[in-house]
Amino acid sequence: MNCRIVFYSAKKTSYCEKALRKSLSGLGLNVKTAAYAVNGEGLGEQLVEAFSDCDIVFTVGGLSFDDRRSIKTVMSNAVRDIETDICRKLKNNGGEDGYILRAGNQILVILPDDPEQLDEILHGCAADYLSAYVKSA
């Protein structure tokens, strides 16, 4: 199953992309493309494009901001009028928590901008959910 990655104000893109591709291949996911956004508007545009042909999109970065640029703030504003089936925190003992949102058959996974942390999340609390989704598709 194909998926896409959107890096949002991420600093460790090449390291994260390599770790993410490796983790996702183990879950039966193939990264179709990777895109980049530096602000909330660009993130929105990239997500619309990504969801136009993939049902699973991963965003990396933006979790460490404490202002309106925070991906948590941007996504809260974006989905406030959308009914989500699942909105779950992906606990990460090694740093920033990730998040998973599902609306219908589309899934957005928000991950920290750190290869070790995203690897821990994808091999930990997100693994069973994503594996089950891929198998059911």
What are the functions of these language-model segments?
Residues M1-N39:
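Glycine-rich phosphate/diphosphate-binding loop of Rossmann-like nucleotide-binding domains
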Residues A37-V48:
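Structural motif
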Residues K32-A34, V134-A137:
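Flexible, glycine/charged-enriched surface loops at secondary-structure junctions
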